[in-house]
């Protein structure tokens, strides 16, 4: 059981107590249900790869988003990973295409630009006549580093913008840190 708990703890966001709860739950299930779970996990791992265009997860050569003709092919939103892409898709606001970098530049972790899907992004922008690139990367040192690096590479090809950062809905100003408040002020927009 300890081995199973250890494996669950390796998943993002799963601590020791949740890992133990998941392990106990699985061990209390009928064997056929556990087998179905294991089969689904192995099938997903072997059948799901990356979209050839945007590097989002996909079981087909092109993901569901890239294969939709109604999407705006002249607009690309750059994200670090598929979780960020899915978060943006939940808003139903963005109607363009995406590009998943596969991480952020982080020299401290040994992740340089060559380890990310940056070269295919630049090739895609140069080849496809992109009208704008939106950078939707996390507001962190790594996100800022990656954004500055990408903006410098892409500016000769098309306009580059970055999503606004600021305060989450329902938050109190007094509890926000200085960087968040500064970004919120910088990203202000006129009232409609």
From Swiss-Prot:
Its BP terms in the Gene Ontology are: DNA recombination; DNA repair
* SUPFAM superfamilies named among the record's database cross-references: Recombination protein RecR (SSF111304)
Record's keyword annotation contains DNA damage: yes
Where the record annotates domain Toprim, the positions are: 74-168
An example of a GO molecular function for this protein is: DNA binding
Q: Which residues form a coiled coil?
A: none
Keywords for this protein: DNA damage, DNA recombination, DNA repair, Metal-binding, Zinc, Zinc-finger
Q: Which Gene3D superfamilies match?
A: 3.40.1360.10, 6.10.250.240, RecR Domain 1
Q: Where are the zinc fingers (C4-type)?
A: 51-66
- The keyword DNA repair belongs to this UniProt entry's keyword annotation: yes
- Would you identify the family this protein belongs to, as annotated? Belongs to the RecR family.
Q: Which PANTHER family match?
A: RECOMBINATION PROTEIN RECR
Q: Any idea what job this protein has? A: May play a role in DNA repair. It seems to be involved in an RecBC-independent recombinational process of DNA repair. It may act with RecF and RecO.
Q: Mind telling me what this protein is named?
A: Recombination protein RecR
